[in-house]
Amino acid sequence: MGQPAKVLQLFKTLHRTRQQVFKNDKRALEAARVKINEEFKKHKNETSPEKIKEMLKIGSDVELLLRTSVIQGIHTDHDTLQLVPRKDLLTENVPYCDAPTQKL
């Protein structure tokens, strides 16, 4: 896949992730939309393949960070937040054992 196609794919992926992560939060959706568009417009005339590759890596890292680390909180009271995790962030409880396993 050529670099222009990769750039367009990353642009679309970032916007899809933005819509999932900030669902029902108009202010965050708009701020993320503006920031994504601003960063892509700022670098639209970049021609160096190395620089483009570096920026693609940064964009992919940002998308991964948004998808795996951001969780929404809703103000329910003066000093209370209700966390609203997405289903893809929830994991099953895994038993933890801090005793080392013995090999025979």
Curated annotation (Swiss-Prot):
GO terms for molecular function: protein folding chaperone. Coiled coil: none annotated. GO terms for cellular component: mitochondrial matrix; mitochondrial membrane. One of its GO terms (biological process) is cellular respiration. The keyword Chaperone applies. Keywords: Chaperone, Mitochondrion, Phosphoprotein. Signal peptide: none annotated. Interacts with UQCRFS1. This is Complex III assembly factor LYRM7. Belongs to the complex I LYR family. The keyword Phosphoprotein applies. The modification Phosphoserine is found at S60. CDD domains: Complex1_LYR_LYRM7 (cd20267). It is found in: Mitochondrion matrix. It holds the Pfam family Complex1_LYR. Assembly factor required for Rieske Fe-S protein UQCRFS1 incorporation into the cytochrome b-c1 (CIII) complex. Functions as a chaperone, binding to this subunit within the mitochondrial matrix and stabilizing it prior to its translocation and insertion into the late CIII dimeric intermediate within the mitochondrial inner membrane.
